[in-house]
Regions:
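Iron-sulfur cluster-binding electron-transfer modules in prokaryotic oxidoreductases
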Residues: 1-263
């Protein structure tokens, strides 16, 4: 999982490719701004994994979830983005399509903050249909609908469990999935990256953020893992800054475990 801009956006890649599994169970993929503009390969991996499991993936024309605006105290902008997204997502939700999110911070915003800021039945319905991608795949696995024919071992994986995923109370879904890959062990690291939305980006808090991420980065260093994973792209910025190692999103490791080539 690398970042710092990309020559292609995820949305552009998706709309130029041939759709798969027409008529299969639909999934609305809320890619997030980070994936669309900086980490398109995470979105590509998610599409590959979902399509491997027979899903018909749709990427609706949504806008930012509103978290950066809310983080900066701009409620008017945040509410405007929420209302716009609800209008796009509601018809999908009403047809029984789950909304699957690729970044924990955005998923937490959609599940928890959206219905508080826009307390309508429509917004509550969209929030209730929203799931983290790992949460969704774990439910598919529990229902016997997940392809578990993994063929490529991933070795020892140091897996950072982001705070905003833990706040969703969905457990550690990707940990269980990756541990089912032959030749793979997962060491979960539950330490804060101290990025905290946009807080860690600000000049006045940058050094404090780096210092607070010390426990996480030390745990990663001493793990001596073959691979490093985190669901949170923002956490990855502090991780790579302090350790020199860029984490993959767990969905990328899952794609690799299937033996699928990177598109």
């Amino acid at each position: 999982m690398t970042g710092a801009g990309s020559s292609r956006t995820f949305a552009r890649w998706f709309r130029r490719r041939k759709a798969a599994n027409a008529g299969g169970p639909k999934v609305a993929l809320f890619a997030t701004c980070s994936v669309d503009y900086n980490y398109p390969q995470v979105g590509v991996a998610a599409v590959q994994v979902l399509e491997k499991n027979g899903k018909s993936v749709e990427v609706p024309r949504v806008v930012c979830c509103g978290l950066p605006a809310l983080d900066g105290g701009d409620l008017e902008t945040a509410i405007g983005k929420i209302e716009r997204n609800v209008a796009v997502l509601l018809p999908l939700v009403q047809s029984g399509t789950p909304v699957v999110v690729l970044a924990p911070s955005c998923g937490l915003m959609m599940k928890s903050e959206w219905p508080q800021l826009v307390p309508t039945d429509e917004c509550r319905a969209v929030a209730a249909a929203t799931m983290d991608v790992g949460e969704y795949l774990a439910k598919e696995k529990a229902a016997g609908r997940l392809d578990t024919n993994f063929t490529v071992p991933q070795g020892k994986v140091a897996y950072h469990i982001p705070c905003h995923l833990r706040a969703q109370n969905v457990g550690q879904p990707f940990r269980a999935i990756l541990q089912s890959v032959p030749g793979t062990t997962v060491e979960a690291i539950e330490q804060c990256s101290a990025f905290d939305g946009t807080w860690g980006m600000k000049t006045e808090y940058y050094e404090t953020s780096r210092k607070c991420a010390g426990k996480l980065c030390s745990a990663i260093t001493v793990s001596n893992a073959d691979k490093l994973a985190s669901d949170c792209m923002l956490a990855g910025l502090n991780i790579v800054e302090e350790t020199g190692c860029a984490p993959s999103h767990p969905i990328e490791l899952m794609r690799d475990a299937y033996g699928l080539r990177q598109e």
